[in-house]
Amino acid sequence: MSAPAQPSSASAGSSAFAVEQLSPDFGFYLRTTELLAECRSPMQHIEIVHTPLFGRAMRIDGCFMTSERDEFFYHEPMVHLPAIAHGDPRQALVIGGGDGGAAHQLLRYPDMARVVLAELDRDVIDMARAWLPAVHRGAFDDPRLTRHLGDRRAFIESCE
């Protein structure tokens, strides 16, 4: 993981707009005030930026992944709907999820004995752990969490 970097598109204390184009006709932008950390892993470019609206946000290859103030819109429905439908979840597999938000939600279930987090890129976990504690809320330190790093498909195929 690389050391924190200063903003590349704005000087410290000023603003810039991060733009994510989703199609030729649609996209969104978000004002960022600081590039808090940046890492170029062998697989992708990971940034942690500060935004006035959403607090700290993670971007991967220029795409917004999660932020401190809206992560629940994503993690809670993704975890709780299947967990409620199941009725008594005791173990779960999170594919991707290196920000730790889904793992945190799963670990809130008192009978959850084991959560496996299968993530391609260790640097995503390291950046989230260091910069997004409001998203993972300590999930990475829970002894019920096991991390598998690398090819997720190969991992699933190796499971019994």
Regions found by a protein language model. Give the residues of each.
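The AdoMet/dcAdoMet-binding core of the Class I SAM-like
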Residues: P7-A18, S41, T66-E160
